[in-house]
Structures are given as C-alpha cells and as structure tokens.
Swiss-Prot record:
Keywords: ATP-binding, Glycoprotein, Membrane, Nucleotide-binding, Receptor, Repeat, Transmembrane, Transmembrane helix, Transport. Glycans are attached at N9, N330. This is ATP-binding cassette sub-family C member 9. The gene is Abcc9. Residues 948-963 have a biased composition (Acidic residues).
Length: 1546
C-alpha cells in the first residue's frame, strides 16, 4: 500500500530544497506539540495526580479560578472552532484531489484532540489548586505558537494571502496560540509558581467554604455555566428524594438581598442628593437601578444580540444547502487549486450543515445565557427593592397608616405586585433593543432573497401586529373583571362555609348555593371574554405568519420575473418565523414597560413618604438587665394584699407608702409641655406635663377617645412632636440628668398594644419574641396570664403555630399572649394598653394580681397601665387622668381624693355601676367558651390530620414498597388518569372537536409546506423560466385560507373546552360540598375547603387551558416535523431512536425536579408576604421593643430563601432548554447530512431542514408544558378528592307530598331507644336514650362537657347517624322524612349567632316567603323593631359580613326573630345564651316564655340555673340519659348529678 500522508505522488516527499520547504513536512511538524501534550497530560490525568495533590479540601467540585480563567475558556473554544474549520477545509480540499492527503487534516484532528485535552487538564489542575502542573500547558502553547508561525511564514513565501482560507485559518491560530501563551505567562506572574521562592497561595471563594451554599453557577467553569452541568446532581437526585430547602441551601453572598440592597441604596441615596439641589425634582429610581444593575443587563443584551445574529444563520444555511442540492454541485473536480477560498469553502453543503449545527449550538447557548443573566439580575433587583421597602416600613410614620394615607393593602401591593412588575420588566429588557435589530436584519435578508415582494409580507406582519396589543389590553381588562367576580364569589363561598351548620339546620343550602352560582355565572361570562381574547391571541400568533407568507409568495409569483426557487422559498419561510416573534413580543414588552413606569411611580411615592421623627428613631436595640434598674428606695410599711377578691371599693383602700415622684428624682419618663399630632398639624394631645415614677405602677384612665393610647404612643415617639420634649431616664447614675438623655437613647419598652398583634409563629415564639428561652420565667408568665390551660388544649402545646398559617385564637386568648410577651421581656419599662378589654372578670383579676402586681412589681419594673377598670385604681402608685387630649389630673389616689373631689366621686359612681355588671358577668365564664371552641378546633384538626394521612396512603397507589424503584416510579409518573378526567369534564363532544381540529390544522399546515415544496421543485426543475403558476398559487391560497380558519377553530375549541370543564368542576364541587355531612366540616379546616374554591379553581379556570393548548400545539408541531423529516429523508429514522431516548430521559428527570422546585418557590413566597403584612400591622410594637434589626434579618432570610428557590427553578429551566436545544441542533445536523446524502429533491430537502429548525424551538416547550400541566393537574386531583365524598341522604322513604302541610302542629316528641354516632367507624355519643316530651312542654337538657347534649339537638335534624332507635315527632318517624322537609319544619337557635352579608330582610327570610308585617312582628318580639326602624332602609338595611355591624347580643336576638318567623311548633336552643351578656339573656328568656308559650322548647343549658324551672329536665352523662324529671324533683336528690351541677355553678 502506498503512503498517503503526503499523497501517493513520490514527489510530495521531496526535501531537496530543505525540510521546511516541503508543505507536507511543515504540517507534520505541527503534530509535534499535540503529541507532546498528549504524552505529558494523559498519564497525569489517568494517575489522578492533580486530584490527589489537592492542597485545599472543599466539598464542591468547582473551586477557585486561576487568573484569566474565563478568557482562557473563550480562547480555547475559539481555537476548537478554528480547528473544526481547519479539519473541514482539509477534508474538502482533500476530496478535490486525485489521491488521499492526510497532512491536510490529520494535524488539525490531532490539534482538536490536544486542545480538548488541554481544557480538561486545566480544569483538573484548577480544581486541585496545583498550578505548577500548568507548566506543561505553557510549553504546549509556546511550541504550538512556533510551529504555526513557521507554517504561516511558509504560506506567505508561497504567495498566499487573505483570499486563501488555509492562510487565514493558520493566521488566526497563531493569534489564538499567542494569546493562550500570554494567559499562561500571566498566571506565572500572578501565582509565582515558577522561578519564585514564595508562590502566591489562593484560597477558594468564601462562598465555597460554606457548606450551605449549593448554588454554584457563579463559581463553575465556563462550560458548566453555559450548559448548567453542575445542576445534573440535583436534578437526577430528585428522583430518589424530593428537593427541599436543605438541598438548595443558601444564596452566595453576592446574590443575597442585603448585598444588592446596599448597592441599590447607595445609588438611590446618590440620586436623592442630586434631587435635593433641585426642589422640583424627585430622585430617579430608574437611574439608581441602572447604576446598581446596569452592567449585567448590558452583558445580557450582548448575549441577546449575538444570539439573534446567529439566528439568521439558519435561513442562510438552508438557502445554501438547498441551492447546492438543487444544482448538484457535489462532484469531484479533476483540476483543483492548491487551496480553497472562503466562497468555495462555503459552497460545500456538508460544510454548511456543520456550520448550521455550530451556529445553532452557539445561538442557543447565548440565548439561554441572556435569559439567565436577566433573571438573576431581576431576582437581585427584587431582593434589593424588598429590603428597601421593608426598611422604609420600619421607618414609616405611624400617622401614614392610622390616618389612611397608606393602607396595608397598598404596602402588600408594593411587595407582591409592583416589585414583581419591575422584575418581569427587567426580564424583558434586552428585547427592547434587540427587537429593532432583529426586525431590520430580517427585512433586509428577505429583501435580498425575494426583492420587493418580501416587503408585502413584512407589511402584513407590521400592520397586523398592533392588533396583538389591542388584544393584550382587552385581556388585561377581562382578567381584572374576572378577578372582581372571583373575589365576590369567594366572599359568598366563605360565608356559606362559615355558616354551613345553620344553613343545613334551616334547609337553606340551595338558596345560598344559588347565590354563589349566580356570581359564578358572571365570573364565567367574564372568563368567556377572557377565553375569546386568548383564542384570538393564539389565532393571531399562528395565522399572521401564514398570511404574510401567502401575501409574499403570491405577489412574487405574479410580480417577479422569475419563478420561486426552493432555496428562496424555505429560507424566506424561516425568516418570516424569525420576524414574527419580535413583533408579537413587542406588545408584551410595551405593556410591561407601562406597568413598570407606574410601579416606579408608586414605589417612589412610598419611599418619599413621611418617616417617623429623627429624634425618636433608633439605630440600635437592646435591653438592660434587671440588675441595672435603679433600685426603689422607698420604705413600704404594709405590703399590698395580692390575693384580695374581685371587689374593689375606693374608700377601703390603703395607699402604699412609697416615696412620691414629687419627693424624689427617681422618675423613668418625663414629658414637658408636650404637644403631639398624628400628622394633620392639629394637636391631638396638648399641654402634656407628666412624670412616670421608676419601679411603680402608673395607671392612665379616662373616657373612650380621650387620648390614653395616644399618650403611650407619643411617649414611644410614634406621634409627631409639635412642641415639648420627652425625657427618658436610662442612665444608671445616682443623680441622672434628664437634659442629657433624649428619647433617641431610650431603652426598649415591653409594649402590649390595645389591639392584639401576633406573629405567624408558635405560641412560644410569640411570647419569648426573640429573647432567650428561660423555662422558669416562661412558666411564671404563662401562669400569670392563665395561658397554660389553653396551651394544654393545643395539639402541639406551645409549639403550635397560631395566626394565618395555624390555629385561630379568640380575642381574649390573643390578648393574653400579647400581655405575656410584654411580661416575659427583660425590660425596665412595661406599657400595657387596655389589657383587660377582651378578658372576663376572672381573667382580669388573675392577670392584675399575678401578672402586674406580683410578677412585674415584685421585680420593681416600671408599669404604665391604660385601663377602663376603675376598680384597680386602689393598686396604682401614680394616676394620670385624661380628658379631651389633655391631662386632667396627675398624682396618687389620695391626692386626687383631696384635690379633686368631683372627679373622685365620679369614679365612685362608675365603679358602683361596674360592680353591678360584675355580678352578672361572674356567671358568664368566657374562658370556658373560648377553650370549648379551641377544643373543637383541635378535634377537627386532629381528624383532618388523620384524613390527610389516609389520603397520602391512597396516593401511594396501594402497592407501596420502600425501595428506590417504587419511589422513582411514583415521582416520575404523569397523572394521565387525572388528565383524562379533566378532559372528559369538558364534554366528549368538545374533546373530540378539539382533537379533530388540532389534527386537521397541523395536517393542513404540513400540506401548505409540502405544496410549497412541490411548487418550487416543479418550476425550478421543469420550468426554469417564467411560467403560468395559477394552479399552484390557487392551491397554496386555498390551503393557507384553510390553515388560518383552522387556527381560529382550534384556539376556540381548546379555550371553550377548558371553560366548560371549569364550569362543571366548580358546579360539582359546590354541590358536593354544600350537600356534604356536617362531620366533614367538623374534621376539615375551613381554609382547606376554601382553597379548593380559590387557588385550585383559579388554576382550573385560567392556567390549565393555555398550558393544554401550548402542549398540544408544540407536541403536534414536533411530531409533524419528525414525520416530515422522515418522509423527506427516511435514513433519519436510524438516528431518531437514540435522540428519542435522550429526550425521554431529559423530560423524565426535569419534570420531577421542576415540580419540587416550583412547590418550593410557591411555599417560600407566603411567609415572605406574611412577614411584610405582620410587620406593618405590628409596627408600633416592633419599634417599642427595639426589634427592628431582628425583623430586618428575618425579612432578609425569607427573601433569600424565596430567591434561592426561584433561582434554582430558573436554572433548572435553563438546564432543560440547553439540553433540548442541543438535541434539536443534533436533529438539524442529522437531517441536514441525511438530506444532502440521500435526496435529490431540493424542495423536500428545504422542507426537512425547515421542520428540523422548528423542532429546536418547540422541544423544550413540550417538556416545560408537560411539567406545568403535571403541577396544575394537582388542583384537579384535589377537587376530585372532594367529589368522591359521600353526600347526606336527602331522600326519605316518604314523599314530601305525604307530609301534612302544617306538620309538626302539636310538638309532641317521642324518643325510642335512641343510639347516635357521628360516623360508622366512631363510638356512639348517645346510647339507648328514651324520653317523652309533651306538646308545648319546656324542656331543659344539661350535663358536663362531652356528655352528648348537643348531639341530641343534632339528632332532631338528622345531622348525625341514628343507627338504632328512632325519634317520632307528631306521629311521624323523622328517619322516613326527606331531609329538606324535616329541617325546614323545625327551628333552632345556635350558640354562635350567625348573620350573612346582605339585608336584614334576607337574614330573617332568605326564601322571601313572609310579608313585611310578619317580619316586623318578629323583630318586635325580639325587641329589635325600634333599632331596625332607626337604620337607613329599615328591613333593607345593610348587614355586613358576619353581622359585624351589630353587637353579639343583637345578632342573637336577630337569630331569635329568625326562629319566630319560621312559626315552627318546636324550637331548640343549643346553648343560645352562652356568648351573650346577662341583659340580652334576660330579654331572650322572656321572649321565649311569651312568644313561644304554646310551642315545644328544648333548651340545652349553658348555665344550669336557667333550666331549674323547666317542665322537664334531661341530665346526660357520657351519652347516657341518667336523670329525667322536673327540676324541683331532681334537686331533692342531693347526690344526683343535676343537684351537683347546680351547686357547682352557683
């Protein structure tokens, strides 16, 4: 076999004129550096020298970067590209020669291998931080530079120049090798690892030494950054274990909110300084954002420009390849030049295919890099803005919130909406300047291809694009309207769920259900409008390119002198697709730009709003230990009785003989000549001169609205000081100087506000409030506030979460936790603002005695107490009496008795009145009621937890095995069953129509492209000149018209099907819930049910339809593309299998990880928003405690947690898109090579390449939409889980027509051996109860908690399961009656009075059956007639949600009037007087005795004494009727249970 390295000609090996004069030997010389590098590096890499010699042990795989790291990677990639060009040029040149010449491409191949090895070698050296091994690379670059220079000089001597491609390639390689050599020299200079005694040691970045930092994008090498390779571990591991917050770790320092806040704050402060010089100018947030975040946006824009320019390589390469195939130029030349020119090189179809592949890889890499940089910058901006807003909230003037200048809703909008608007605008920013370039370039290329006819198509796009903007504005309007109706529907649904027990007992479910359905119909009407405009938007996106292509090609057919060529046609098609995208995106960018401008205006207004006065603003926080408090020096002759009973008389007090403030300078706070305002300019408090003694109890009293709370806030610095000063004595000296201690240096104050404010945290965290936990102190505080019994009822004790995300507590319980927080804090001063307002007398007394007098005063803490409980004045060491914003009197009680007798007598009168009310209140034990409510909530919560556990077990699909494969199978499985269930909810006809229209539409689109391929191929081959094209033009026009029509049909059917499914699912859900058993509502939290009607319904309404449309469109486009490529070049099917396998695994791994990350993003948003709202609500408390820094830190942590979740989600999306884009590029390369090699039909080649390019755009959308749909189907699954619930059996064995019209007329009740339980699997709550109630008899039922009293009342209405025995009313067994009939004929008054929003008339008679006279009669009986008449509208007067515009007593009387309206002969009162005062109870009892004198009344007693005179008393114990007789007879049995209950309640 002859030698072929230099060719078969022996003269090729001639070295007569010298070795360097032979080009072949020069090429062989170029092999030396590559062989050297491979010989040196391979042993090092295989032995693992670098990794074993690592001097720095860190947990990550990527590490420090040597100097010039990024430049080295860029130069290496450039060198690899040039090597590819050199290989291609050598192969093409060799193909034109008679014999094989390996020297033309073999050195280039070795160079490619060596360069690849160099970057692998460098990466390993860098990760091991062992720079001495870089010496091999330095030698390699030097040798490569020398050999390439020799080669370049040789070419120069031969007379080659820039017109010769090989000369240009060699020149570029000399430059690149020289630059890489310079990079190595720089590393030697900086690291000093050669010829230096003391090498420079470099530690890895600080972030990488933190084990918690898992977001490695800033630290990895350039290749890993571009491909997100470092995400592989997380995404693959998601199959084995769900991704949690621990897995994603912490943010790197540079990305943390505090870092970005500092940058933005400095930039904004600079703008404020500039604006200060111009009175009419406001600081520019835009400029501040540009200064802080401009550089990454410019970098992103650069990436975007490069991506967009590379995007045009696709159409150009398609044109070139199709043209080459059409001309059939791929033949061997007999005569060939020594070297190729660039033009000749690019005329090779295979070269164009490779260039197209590389261009796609680069384009997609740059595009994803642009996306990532903008998203990261947007997240950083959002974090900085949130920190700025939060910092401003902490400095916000209290008057802004209290006077309504700024609402909590506005602040929440700033946090949740405006910052997101700016973030999204930043995401779209690069489009602003990239789009014009893309459009201009597209039009120029189209014009070059098709001439003036291309301008017609461009004009069609430009003219139709504004319609998209119009549609977008209409979509926004429809969405706002939908949101309004949705809010109204949720409000009504919430009312139904809160009052479901009453609705069922009164058989009003269908009335209220109808009301919700009416609102739902309005919402659906708005959703129809939204769906219509969405359909139009989808239609325009699909139809405009078709219309533009039609207009262009028809114009070209008749106006141009030439036939349409395949190269021109398919390149134009590709260009039109590129051109349409920026024009459509323009409307979105403009819309977001307008929103961003508005958001910046709102943000600027907020940041420039009034702040709290500088004299009261604190930079630090801290508390002084008790030991540093100034000790009380007075002599106390007689201790205060801490245990005296709850009766107080002013005349019987003994004043503690402590030194008065007038006699000592031991004063904690002093206000002189104080005038304070809430910002209006008018003084709310005037002429305030007060002193608060240290270590004593100061009480502030006065009428409602006199300024007591305002005085506390003024002292705390929350009000605007118009005049005067507030002095704090916090200097631990024997003679403190007040003039030297201003309020700016005051210490923290433990403050309990009048309105209780709690964190969304555990009970313990609310009480300790950031202070160290001290078990002994904590127990003392909870005992002092009577909290321990309440804590014992909670499922997790004091570790139970309270607030929005936890247990809802009553007002009294919330108040006591707030007071406990103030008591627990280690502060010298305690401010308590009306702490007794929500407490009953027992709790008030206990708190006063144990909490204030014992716990606080024994520690000599200064206590300032605002109260209306004048009976506690006897304990005050100092009293401040206020009236109309001024101090009326100040001093001890003795001083006031002596100096202001009139005031003293007034207090005595008020105390006597309070004492009379106290006699009544002593019987009403509010605490018992609160704890009973809490116990019920806990019972429901535990049951709900049990249900959730059962649901989780069901979700694991019966066959749960604790092994890896099972876990992976469950986590990767798509919920196809749920998808099918959703689709069929929209109706089989619409489902069929959607599938059929979708398939038909894509078939027509394929037919359009195939017709074009046939048309252009036919006329380019058979009719080279001008020919009649009417047939093809007509066919093309018809198909385009059909395609446009089908685009509209498909978009409408998808939206319509989604709307129908949403309508049916909500209708079924509402009916299922409202007809569900009462047990379901007892065991399922209200928030959980409401979530199905809010978040889940919103997903079904608005999110699933567009996702489904996008998924079906992108999937069918990809399938069409694969089908068309396979048809054009069948050999492509061979490569399809491995590509399909790769795609399968990519989507499989991504879907699981994406779902976890999306859930993390959603779950971390709520705590952040809650923290902002709770801070704004508790601003005064936070500032009083001086906990601003702690709350700032918490906000920064929550922001970073949400940001890291969002960043990982974004990185996961980039991970997917890079891989699917690269997969698409591989498809394009495979299709190109297959088309060139196997097809002679240029039209089909163009068609195949066009569809291959389409795949690159839609592959990632298939996976993204699949992942989104999987998450969204979770909402459908949740709704479906409720639809499987069993409803109450509303049917009876009797027909409603068989029930007498006036039944029950007599009111006779017979209870036969009654056994009742709540569910089949639960124990009985009533066992074999037998009783007889005569018509019109008044019956009392009593027993201890849990004895079964309320269960009996529910049994009358069949709200519980009567599994044995029966109840017969007026001769009819109630189990045979239809439920609606039974419940509509009985009346009940519940413990909790429930009113619904609407009118008084609606609340009394929702069925609208009664006349006005009957309603007025009922109101008169309930003693409400005069009050209702005084209201505007009378019977039509407005009732707010929950009846909050009426007192609890009035609401209960309305419930009584409601019961009377029904005219039933049986009335059941279930602890109806438990939550009302004594006066209202007397009214209610009187009405019942008169208005219901001839009716049977069954009273379940809250206070046993109220049923002593009842005609029949039933006493229950543990579900058994133990006593049954008249009250007097039962009292004769001294050891009986009834007697015991009566004695206990006395």
């Amino acid at each position: 076999m002859s030698l072929s390295f230099c060719g078969n000609n022996i003269s090729s090996y001639n070295i007569y004129y010298g070795v360097l004069q032979n080009p072949c030997f020069v090429d062989a010389l170029n092999l030396v550096p590559h062989v050297f590098l491979l010989f040196i590096t391979f042993p090092i890499l295989f032995i693992g020298w670098g990794s074993q010699s690592s001097k720095v042990q860190i947990h990550h795989n990527t590490w420090l970067h040597f100097p010039g790291h990024n430049l080295r990677w860029i130069l290496t990639f450039a060198l690899l590209f040039v090597h590819v060009c050199e290989i291609a040029e050598g192969i093409v040149s060799d193909s034109h020669r008679a014999s094989r010449h390996l020297h033309l491409f073999m050195p280039a191949v070795m160079g490619f291998v060596a360069t690849t090895t160099s970057i692998v070698y460098y990466h390993n050296i860098e990760t091991s931080n062992f720079p001495k091994l870089l010496l091999a690379l330095f030698l390699y670059w030097v040798m490569a530079f020398i050999t390439k220079t020799i080669k370049l000089v040789k070419y120069w001597q031969l007379g080659w120049g820039v017109s010769d491609l090989r000369f240009c390639i060699t020149g570029v390689m000399v430059i690149l090798n020289g630059l890489l050599m310079a990079v190595e020299i720089n590393v030697i200079r900086v690291r000093r690892y050669v010829f230096f005694m003391n090498p420079q040691k470099v530690k890895p970045p600080e972030d990488l030494q933190d084990l918690g930092v898992r977001f490695l994008q800033p630290f990895v090498n350039l290749l890993s950054k571009a491909t997100y390779w470092w995400m592989n571990t997380l995404i693959i591991s998601a199959h084995r274990k769900p991704i949690d917050l621990k897995a994603i770790g912490k943010l790197p320092i540079a990305m943390r909110a505090v870092t970005n806040y500092v940058c933005l704050k400095e930039a904004y402060e600079e703008q404020k300084k500039k604006a200060a010089d111009h009175p009419n100018r406001t600081p520019s947030i835009w400029l501040a954002m540009y200064r802080a975040f401009g550089r990454p946006i410019l970098l992103s824009s650069t990436f975007r420009y490069l991506a967009d320019l590379l995007g045009f390589a696709g159409p150009l390469c398609i044109s070139g390849i199709v043209q080459r195939v059409n001309e059939k130029t791929n033949t061997t030349r007999e005569m060939f030049p020594e070297t190729l020119s660039s033009k000749e090189f690019l005329e090779n179809a295979h070269v164009l295919a490779v260039l197209l592949f590389l261009a796609l890889i680069l384009q997609r890499t740059f595009l994803q890099a642009s996306y990532y940089v903008t998203i990261e910058t947007g997240i950083n901006l959002r974090g900085a803005l949130l920190a700025m807003i939060y910092n401003k909230i902490l400095r916000l003037s209290t008057s802004n919130l209290s006077m309504g200048e700024m609402t909590l809703g506005q602040i929440n909008n700033l946090v949740a909406i405006e910052t997101n608007q700016l973030m999204w605008f930043l995401f779209l920013c690069p489009n602003l300047w990239a789009m014009p370039v893309q459009i201009i370039m597209g039009v120029i290329l189209l014009y070059n291809l098709l001439g003036s006819s291309a301008l017609v198509g461009a004009a069609v796009i430009v003219l139709l694009a504004p319609i998209q903007y119009f549609i977008a504005t209409k979509l926004a309007e429809a969405q706002k309207s939908t949101l309004d109706y949705s809010t109204e529907r949720l409000k009504k649904t919430n009312e139904i769920l809160k009052g479901i027990k009453l609705l069922k007992l009164y058989a009003w479910e269908h009335i209220f259900c109808k009301s919700v359905e009416e609102t739902r119909m309005k919402e659906l009407s708005s959703l129809k409008t939204f769906a219509l405009y969405t359909s139009l938007s989808i239609f325009m996106n699909a139809a405009i390119p078709i219309a533009a292509v039609l207009a262009t090609f028809v114009t070209h057919a008749y106006a141009s002198g030439n036939n349409l060529k395949p190269a021109e046609a398919f390149a134009s098609l590709s260009l039109f697709h590129i051109l349409v995208t920026p024009l459509f995106l323009l409307s979105t960018v403009v819309r977001f730009a307008v929103k961003a401008i508005i958001s910046v205006q709102k943000l600027n207004e907020f940041l420039l709003s009034d702040e709290i006065g500088e004299d009261s603003w604190r930079a630090g926080e801290g508390t002084l230990p008790f030991e540093s408090c100034k000790k009380h020096t007075g002599v106390q002759s007689k201790p205060i009785n801490r245990k005296q009973p709850g009766r107080y008389h002013l005349d019987s007090y003994e004043q503690a003989r402590r030194l008065r403030p007038a006699e000592t300078e031991d004063i904690a706070i002093k206000v002189t000549n104080g005038y304070f305002s809430w910002g209006s300019g008018l003084a709310t408090l005037s002429n305030i001169d007060i002193r608060i003694p240290t270590g004593q109890l100061t009480m502030i009293v006065g009428q409602v609205g006199c300024g007591k709370s305002s005085l506390l806030l003024a002292i705390l610095g929350e009000m605007q000081t118009l005049e005067g000063k507030v002095y704090w004595n916090n200097v631990n000296e024997s003679e403190p100087s007040f003039e030297a201690t201003r309020s700016r240096s005051r210490y923290s104050v433990a403050y309990a506000a009048q309105k209780p404010w709690l964190l969304n945290a555990t009970v313990e965290e609310n009480i300790t409030f950031g202070s160290p936990f001290n078990r002994q102190r904590y127990k003392a505080v909870t005992d002092a506030c009577s909290l321990q019994p309440d804590i014992d009822l909670l499922p997790f004790g004091d570790q139970t979460e309270i607030g929005e995300r936890g247990i809802n507590l009553s007002g009294g319980q919330r108040q006591r936790i707030c007071v406990a927080r103030a008591l627990y804090q280690n502060t010298n001063i305690v401010f308590l603002d009306d702490p007794f307002s929500a407490l009953d007398i027992h709790l008030s007394d206990h708190l006063m005695q144990e909490g204030i007098l014992k716990f606080l005063q024994d520690d000599k803490r200064t206590v300032v107490l605002v109260t209306h409980k004048l009976q506690y004045l006897t304990h005050a060491d100092w009293i401040i009496a206020m009236k109309d914003g001024s101090v009326l009197r100040e001093g001890t009680l003795k001083d006031i008795q002596t100096k202001d007798v009139e005031l003293y007598e007034h207090w005595k009168t008020l105390m006597n009145r309070q004492d009379q009310e106290l006699e009544k209140d002593m019987e009403a034990d509010q605490t018992t009621l609160e704890r009973k409510t809490l116990r019920r909530a806990m019972y429901s919560r535990e049951a709900k937890a049990q249900m959730e556990d059962e649901d989780e077990e069901e979700e694991e699909e019966e066959d749960e095995e604790d092994n890896m494969s099972t876990v992976m199978r469950l986590r990767t499985k798509m919920p196809w069953k749920t998808c099918w269930w959703y689709l069929t909810s929209g109706g089989f006809f619409l489902l069929f129509l959607m599938i059929f229209s979708k398939l038909l539409k894509h078939s027509v689109i394929v037919a359009i492209d195939y017709w074009l391929a046939t048309w252009t191929s036919e006329y380019s081959i058979n009719h080279p000149g001008k020919a009649d094209q009417t047939f093809y033009v007509a066919g093309f026009s018809i198909l385009c018209g059909a395609g446009i029509f089908l685009c509209l049909v498909t978009s409408l059917t998808v939206e319509w099907m989604g709307l129908t499914a949403a309508k049916n699912l909500h209708h079924n859900l509402l009916n299922k819930i409202i007809l569900g058993p009462i047990r379901f509502f007892d065991t399922t939290p209200l928030g959980l049910i409401l979530n199905r009607f809010s978040a889940d319904t919103n997903i079904i309404d608005q999110h699933i339809p567009p996702t489904l449309e996008s998924l079906t469109r992108s999937t069918l486009l990809c399938l069409s593309a694969i089908g068309m490529i396979s048809y054009a070049t069948p050999v492509f099917l061979v490569a399809l299998a491995p590509l399909g396998v790769a795609f399968y695994f990519i989507q499989k791994y991504f879907r699981v990880a994406s779902k976890d990350l999306q859930e993390l993003d959603d779950s971390t948003q709520l705590p952040l928003l809650c923290h902002f709202s709770e801070t704004a609500e508790g601003l005064t408390t936070i500032r009083a405690f001086r906990h601003e820094t702690r709350f700032k830190q918490r906000m920064l942590e929550l922001t970073d947690t949400n940001n890291i979740a969002y960043l990982f989600l974004s990185a996961a999306n980039r991970w997917l898109e890079v891989r699917t884009d690269y997969l698409g590029a591989c498809i394009v390369l495979t299709a190109s090579i297959a088309s060139i090699s196997g097809s002679s039909n240029s039209g089909l080649v163009g068609l195949g390449l066009l569809y291959a390019l389409t795949i690159t755009n839609y592959l990632n959308w298939v996976v993204r939409n699949l992942a989104d749909l999987e998450v969204q189907m979770g909402a459908v699954k949740k709704v479906n889980s409720f639809l499987t619930m069993e409803s109450e059996n509303y049917e009876g064995t009797m027909d409603p027509s068989q029930v007498p019209e006036h039944w029950p007329q007599e009111g006779e009740i017979k209870i036969h051996d009654l056994c009742v339980r709540y569910e089949n699997n639960l124990k009985p709550v009533l066992k074999h109860v037998k009783a007889y109630i005569k018509p019109g008899q008044k019956v009392g039922i009593c027993g201890r908690t849990g004895s079964g009293k309320s269960s009996l009342s529910l049994a009358f209405f069949r709200m519980v399961d009567i599994f044995d025995g029966k109840i017969v009313i007026d001769g009819i067994d109630i189990s045979k009656l239809p439920l609606h009939t039974l419940r509509s004929r009985l009346s009940i008054i519940l413990q909790d009075p429930i009113l619904f929003s609407g009118s008084i008339r609606f609340n009394l008679d929702p069925e609208c059956k009664c006349t006005d006279d009957r309603l007025w009669e009922a109101l008169e009986i309930a003693q409400l007639k005069n009050m209702v008449k005084s209201l505007p509208g009378g019977l039509d007067a407005t009732v707010t949600e929950g009846g909050e515009n009426f007192s609890v007593g009035q609401r209960q009387l309305f419930c009584l009037a409601r019961a009377f309206v029904r005219k039933s002969s049986i009335l059941i009162m279930d602890e109806a007087t438990a939550s009302i005062d004594m006066a209202t109870e007397n009214i209610l009892q009187k009405v019942v005795m008169t208005a219901f004198a001839d009716r049977t009344v069954v009273t379940i007693a809250h206070r046993v004494s109220s049923i002593v005179d009842a005609g029949l008393v039933l006493v229950f114990s543990e579900g058994i009727l133990v006593e049954c007789d008249t009250g007097p007879n039962l009292l004769q049995h001294k050891n009986g249970l009834f007697s015991t209950l009566v004695m206990t309640n006395k």
